[in-house]
Amino acid sequence: MAPTLFQKLFSKRSGLGAPGRDARDPDCAFSWPLPEFDPSQIRLIVYQDCERRGRNVLFDSSVKRKNEDTSVSKLCNDAQVKVFGKCCQLKPGGDSSSSLDSSITLSSDGKDQCPKYQGSRCSSDANMLGEMMFGSVAMSYKGSTLKIHQIRSPPQLMLSKVFTARTGSSICGSLNTLQDSLEFINQDSNTLKADSSTVSNGLLGNIGLSQFCSPRRAFSEQGPLRLIRSASFFAVHSNPMDMPGRELNEDRDSGIARSASLSSLFITPFPSPNSSLTRSCASSYQRRWRRSQTTSLENGVFPRWSVEESFNLSDESCGPNPGIVRKKKIAIGVIFSLSKDEDENNKFNEFFFSHFPLFESHMNKLKSAIEQAMKMSRRSADASQRSLAYNRILDALTEFRTTICNLYTMPRIGEPVWLTMMSGTPEKNQLCHRFMKEFTFLMENASKNQFLPALITAVLTNHLAWVPTVMPNGQPPIKIFLEKHSSQSVGMLAKTHPYNPLWAQLGDLYGAIGSPVRLARTVVVGKRQDLVQRLLYFLTYFIRCSELQETHLLENGEDEAIVMPGTVITTTLEKGEIEESEYVLITMHRNKSSLLFKESEETRTPNCNCKYCSHPVLGQNTENVSQPEREDTQDNSKELLGISDECQKISPPDCQEENAVDVQQYRDKLRTCLDTKLETVVCTGSAPADKCVLSETCLEPREESWQNKELLDSDNHTGTAMRPTGIVVEKKPPDKNVPSAFSCEVTQTKVTFLIGDSMSPDSDTELRSQAVVDQINRHHSEPLKEDRGVADKHQESKITKDQSEDSDTQNIVSGESCELPCWSHSDPESMSLFDEYFNDDSIETRTIDDVPVKTSTDSKEYCCMLEYPKRLYTKTNKQKSELCKCIETVHQDSCNACFPQQDQRNSLSILVPHGDKESSDKKNAVGTEWDIPRNESSDSALGDSESEDTGPDIRRQAGGYCGGDQEDWTEEDEIPFPGSKLIEVSAVQPNIANFGRSLLGGYCSSYVPDFVLQGIGNDERLRQCLVSDLSHAVQHPVLDEPIAEAVCIIADMDKWTVQVASSQRRVTDNKLGKEVLVSSLVSNLLHSTLQLYKHNLSPNFCVMHLEDRLQELYFKSKMLSEYLRGQMRVHVKELGVVLGIESSDLPLLAAVASTHSPYVAQILL
């Protein structure tokens, strides 16, 4: 049997290149690490703190032991229940009196029917946990307080929330809470009396209708919401990160931060950041901006949009009696007992903090159940009712435990299609091929009853995050398809107005970007696991979200290590050599442990004397602003020259005979220019095109230095790699006229910045530059023309030798500028407001000395680069055409001699951002396929925040993105830098701290309500939980913003039906939801793509066609929204006649239009 897609599914994350296992194998679990977690590791404890009574334990799950397995539902049918003992009273001395709240025994005639609980004394840690929960919160404080505690011995993680009760007096029943009801169950109901001292505060209140509609009410009643975090939170969690959906701006004096639950309001008092965005208030961009405003303390403290901060025990049918109200607080604590394995604990910690909104949402659901149970126990004088109320809490705890365990342990889809495309994989061709094979299989085997078109229609209608990915961005479709980066507008927003990227990713997954906001999830039901898994994999192309990149920040004295997957970046503070100011040295190192392949010595040819083989290249995207100390540069140059000498020894004799220049005499010059650095090219404000910021004296000497250096390189055929990949500094002194490397309409200006050092023409550093001039003049011996002649001679010979090389490379070698398609910037009108998956147009390139030399005709262009290889260069609005050309102009003249038959280094070093070339197969031969720096998402404030380009006018350039295809820079000999602590992070495993991968479930044994996508064997559990889950999603939304509707798409592969269940519709006729109306547009989209593939068109082209057809849906929705503008009521027939929109397409187009034109929903929905 031929290997299937899942057998061949990327094995690059499996560690050391082991062959991929069949992901359909249950043991494989889609290559997702399956942790173990037992429900018994979750403990619930409830406290009451009363002004008069002090602190009591109301409930503690750890001290109950069932002696019989009889169902709780049979409790007390005919048995007389006797409950004795009072609540555990916590005394200051630490002693605990009596037993816990209830110790249930049964009369002799009921022993066989009811479960029996054996009472025990309070747990030994009750005092400690109570102090941790209540802390120093004043009794008069009316808000709720959320805390996260990490207990080291035994290892535990506790999530606690303290609430103020809202109790109303009642003359129709007892005012007692659970504690009081348990105390008085035993008494005659006629003698029950209201005791004002037993009025309890509540836990986490329900959302009343008035509270749901009036977010301001919460603020007036409760005041600011705060979070008090225990110190151990920071001590244990080694990589502090925001809790998703929150903004924790800590007050360093008081240790009190904003509530971790603080959320954005649906309507904010802030003006729109751009008048052109006002019409898209429901867009992804606007949601992110609103989130930034309402989670920033600069704008004051905002309340949650709904009131969940108090516990409502009041009985609305009874009148108030404020005379007997006492101040009380209730605390709920959920304690997770961790294992003794430190690695497992770290995994759970990472999962807990990254998925905190889900934990809090389920805690709110647990609180609601406890609240209802307390109300039940208060209303009834019947002892059996109160016991049932107690057991309701146990049932709610059981459900909470099951949900959390399933969320943590269920299998996930190992390689979602869309996220894998987003992550810059070099296997795009293979990925498209596999996707199209699965697509063809499903179209042929799962189209009964139009099942697949109906399912895709439902997914595209509800999971709306695909819309921003197809919106036009002024780029050709091939570029958009290949690079899939983030948008300019959203990328800029992430820098200037940071929001939590995990929150944005979660909203994308649930499709909550339309208006009104809707949460969606998809469940595939089927007994054939193989078929269900293939469909789940296929759906991960349409259910999209942003890809995130996590950055770990560790401090070590004055040094700081910023660790990204696969790399280590260190920053140190260095003193200036000329001026007294200090500057920052930022250095990037390759992560050795994450390398999958090392090039063997045999792959290097004996006569290889190129820089690539001798000194491999660094290839990460990061900016460096530095001027290292003299001794560091000496070490670097010595090492470089040593390598150059070594290359000479193994070079052919005829090459050695041409060595006319002694390497040693350039040692001093190299010290000033051979440091391993990176640069980031960004736009600055426009500067005069005819002026050069760098002084002429800074440039001319390097021209002369280049002559000698070029002669050395051309004679030896060695590429000492003086020019950067992609970006050259094309500015020349005003009096020089050297042909440019690019055909550009307007010559632009390079501006150089150095932290702590002024580089203006009148700077003191000109003295230093002059010293360099004098030094170079002493060694200057030959005119430029002679050097050019020698260089051109070798250039021509190399062109003849390497006719099989890429045409772009030949153009470069011959000194011609590489002409590539030229795309201009999109004007503001065509810029997408939330096109967050398009090009993040930053160009981050290398200025290190390991790329072959440029032809001598362009030598002067490199003067700036050679003079200041360690600077951060900025530029003025360079056209994309230059960047596209420039990224292709990697000079390969030195490398061609090394690999005449299959120049692996050559194929690796030439980036192909505009289309996969045939040489892409070579790329996979050498290099770490799985260790690619991920494309920075628009949501990744982690990566973006480190960037220098934070100005409002920044337009990051698209053509030269150097991240997605940089699998070639794999080998690097790390040189330890003094005073820097290097931290290595391995990124070979799927990241569980990422909603995009953790919420796309595989084939699960049980229904998991939090999963955005999952497969299950039967719908029994789904039918039980669906209604309550949808209601809970609206009442306690994980996104902390009002949700109008929660929907669930149920695709039954046994019955070939697709239904959509909604929180706004009641289930009728034993159906889970409403049947889906198949969109003719979607049906045509699927069939046309299938026909193209059957006609043997390339999988890449078929997927591009699929993207084009999705974009057509967007354009039709724009047309619909424009037609509906200003209208109040439109007939469907009118839309069909005027716009050609069929009635079956209207729900889909209206949903898509709601992402950019909210008024459409008011007219059509």
From Swiss-Prot:
Subunit structure: Homodimer and homomultimer. Heterodimer and heteromultimer with FNIP2. Interacts with FLCN (via C-terminus). Component of the lysosomal folliculin complex (LFC), composed of FLCN, FNIP1 (or FNIP2), RagA/RRAGA or RagB/RRAGB GDP-bound, RagC/RRAGC or RagD/RRAGD GTP-bound, and Ragulator. Interacts with HSPCA and with the PRKAA1, PRKAB1 and PRKAG1 subunits of 5'-AMP-activated protein kinase (AMPK). Phosphorylated FLCN and AMPK are preferentially bound. Interacts with HSP70, STIP1, PTGES3, CDC37, BRAF, GCR and CDK4. Interacts with HSP90AA1; the interaction inhibits HSP90AA1 ATPase activity.
Location of Phosphoserine modifications: 220, 230, 232, 261, 296, 593-594, 760, 763, 907, 937-938, 940, 945, 947
Region named KY-finger: 611-612
Phosphoprotein among keywords: yes
Alphabetical list of Pfam families matching this protein: FNIP_C, FNIP_M, FNIP_N
This protein's domain notes: The KY-finger orients the Cys degron for ubiquitination by the CRL2(FEM1B) complex.
Effect seen on changing T603A: Does not affect recognition by the CRL2(FEM1B) complex and subsequent ubiquitination
Residue ranges with Basic and acidic residues bias: 779-804, 914-924
Keyword vocabulary terms for this entry: Cytoplasm, Glycoprotein, Isopeptide bond, Lysosome, Membrane, Oxidation, Phosphoprotein, Ubl conjugation
Domain uDENN FNIP1/2-type: 37-478
Residues given in the record as Zn(2+) 2 binding sites: C610, C613
Biological processes, Gene Ontology terms: B cell apoptotic process; cellular response to starvation; immature B cell differentiation; negative regulation of cell population proliferation; negative regulation of lysosome organization; negative regulation of TOR signaling; negative regulation of transcription by RNA polymerase II; positive regulation of B cell apoptotic process
Ranges for domain cDENN FNIP1/2-type: 486-1091
Chain segments carrying region Interaction with HSP90AA1: 928-1165
Protein's UniProt name: Folliculin-interacting protein 1
Function: Binding partner of the GTPase-activating protein FLCN: involved in the cellular response to amino acid availability by regulating the non-canonical mTORC1 signaling cascade controlling the MiT/TFE factors TFEB and TFE3. Required to promote FLCN recruitment to lysosomes and interaction with Rag GTPases, leading to activation of the non-canonical mTORC1 signaling.
Effect annotated for changing R604A: Does not affect recognition by the CRL2(FEM1B) complex and subsequent ubiquitination
Organism the protein comes from: Mus musculus
Localization per record: Lysosome membrane; Cytoplasm, Cytosol
